[in-house]
């Protein structure tokens, strides 16, 4: 699928043999290199350079992260002996002077906060998943409330550089707190699992809107949500759209607009888009209760919606968030309902 994305988030484990995949890259690449901290830093950079030569790409951003930091270490506990992160960043800038060198962790904010970057860097990185402590629906939908604190904290040590958050998915990509991701053969709501049964659900879309609204900050410049295919994908293996695809198409449509987060009202998270002198609101009810809200603007509006009544047939009815109907200023939200509102 030819999605108009700005970059490809591409993670490679350099502790394993590297290989060629010349058909992979048609966009700027954000390469995340998981490396062996016991290896000579110059040899690490040579390995990365060799990989890029095997896989011709426009390398736009690079994060070099010791693979051992996929594990979580307690602040007062024993930490591994690893070269300073600044040594990796300095070497990366020397080998790749035209590339933006990112700092941070591949895993969650907890690990980033415990191992803050040092030295010079061009951006900062962490990911976000909701099923660390509580995989219940309530636990998942409560996690966006933590993001304002997280973003404010990151701002204190980001050196005022751009922030990349991602991947942002219900299921986990790595388990910093155990030997491996939890097996979830029965596809239940399970902490630390890679596959989450709600990935293709309306809850997943509503949660994604809530998360996106809360990571908006002056330095939030890059966001990676899902994969194209696979467990965290937005397409099936035969290229059919999965539900999250409709939301990501919408977010990509607004990528060049001015984006603001709206004040949370009850359980309704939202975003305001200003584009070509037009105003749009993307709002999501993150609760199991029906909610009612009124927009401040005393203007005529049009709306589209996605709730349980039309979600089950999302692929059958040529659904689009841009199929608007006239509406007023009072809006009723079903559980997990998402609305796109256009102010006329």
Located regions from the model:
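Carbohydrate-binding surface patches
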Residues: 265-297, 308
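Aromatic/acidic polysaccharide-binding cleft in carbohydrate-active enzymes
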Residues: 164-246, 263-264, 269
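Catalytic domains of carbohydrate-active enzymes, especially glycoside hydrolases
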Residues: 1-32, 51-59
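Tight coil/turn sites that cap or link beta-strands
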Residues: 298-309, 333-338
């Amino acid at each position: 699928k030819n999605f108009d994305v700005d970059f490809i988030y591409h993670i490679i484990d350099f502790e394993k043999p590297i290989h060629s995949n010349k058909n992979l890259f048609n966009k700027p690449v954000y390469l995340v290199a998981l490396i062996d901290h016991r290896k000579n830093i110059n040899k690490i950079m040579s390995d990365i350079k060799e990989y890029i030569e095997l896989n011709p790409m426009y390398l736009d951003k690079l994060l070099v992260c010791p693979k051992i930091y996929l594990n979580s270490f307690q602040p007062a506990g024993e930490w591994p002996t690893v070269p300073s992160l600044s040594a990796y960043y300095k070497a990366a800038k020397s080998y790749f002077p035209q590339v933006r060198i990112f700092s941070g962790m591949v895993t969650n904010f907890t690990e980033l906060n415990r191992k803050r970057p040092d030295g010079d860097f061009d951006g900062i990185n962490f990911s976000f998943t909701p099923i660390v402590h509580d995989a219940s629906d309530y636990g998942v939908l409560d996690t966006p409330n933590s993001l304002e604190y997280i973003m404010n904290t990151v701002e204190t040590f980001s050196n005022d550089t751009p922030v990349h958050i991602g991947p942002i998915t219900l299921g986990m990509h790595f388990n910093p707190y155990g030997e491996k991701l939890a097996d979830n053969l029965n596809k239940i709501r399970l902490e630390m699992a890679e596959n989450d049964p709600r990935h293709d659900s309306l809850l997943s879309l509503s949660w994604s809107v809530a998360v996106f609204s809360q990571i908006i900050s002056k330095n939030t410049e890059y966001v990676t949500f899902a994969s194209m295919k696979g467990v965290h994908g937005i397409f099936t293996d035969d290229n059919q759209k999965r539900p999250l695809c409709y939301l990501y198409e919408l977010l990509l449509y607004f990528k060049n607009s001015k984006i603001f987060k709206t004040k949370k009202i009850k359980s309704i998270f939202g975003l305001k888009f200003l584009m070509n002198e037009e105003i749009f609101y993307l709002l999501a009810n993150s609760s199991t209760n029906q909610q009612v809200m009124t927009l401040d603007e005393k203007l005529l509006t049009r709306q589209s919606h996605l709730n349980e009544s039309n979600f089950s047939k999302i692929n059958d009815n040529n659904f689009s968030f841009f199929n608007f109907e006239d509406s007023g200023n009072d809006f009723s939200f079903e559980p997990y309902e998402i609305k796109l509102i256009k102010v006329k």
